[in-house]
Swiss-Prot record:
The keyword Metal-binding does not apply. Keywords: Ribonucleoprotein, Ribosomal protein. It comes from the Bacteria. Belongs to the bacterial ribosomal protein bL33 family. GO terms for molecular function: structural constituent of ribosome. This is Large ribosomal subunit protein bL33. Residues 19-40 are annotated as: Disordered. It comes from Prochlorococcus marinus (strain AS9601).
Length: 64
């Protein structure tokens, strides 16, 4: 049988969606799923992704 891989599926969530108070934008949480290599990247991921609720690029952090 094959060994278990070091890749794990992680969820990225927008950090600015909850702090936004713009009434023109709908409330919602932007989440993305991706994979990361646990051996090479031990710390939490932090990427800039598009948030469709805020209609701009925002920082998305890895959640547990």
């Amino acid at each position: 049988m094959a060994k278990k891989g070091t890749r794990v599926v992680v969820t990225l969530e927008c950090t600015e969606a909850r702090t936004s108070t713009d009434p023109k934008r709908s409330n919602g949480v932007s989440r993305y799923t991706t994979e990361k290599n646990r051996r090479n990247t031990t710390e939490r991921l932090e990427l800039k992704k598009f948030n469709p609720h805020l209609n701009r690029m925002t920082i998305h952090k890895e959640i547990k």
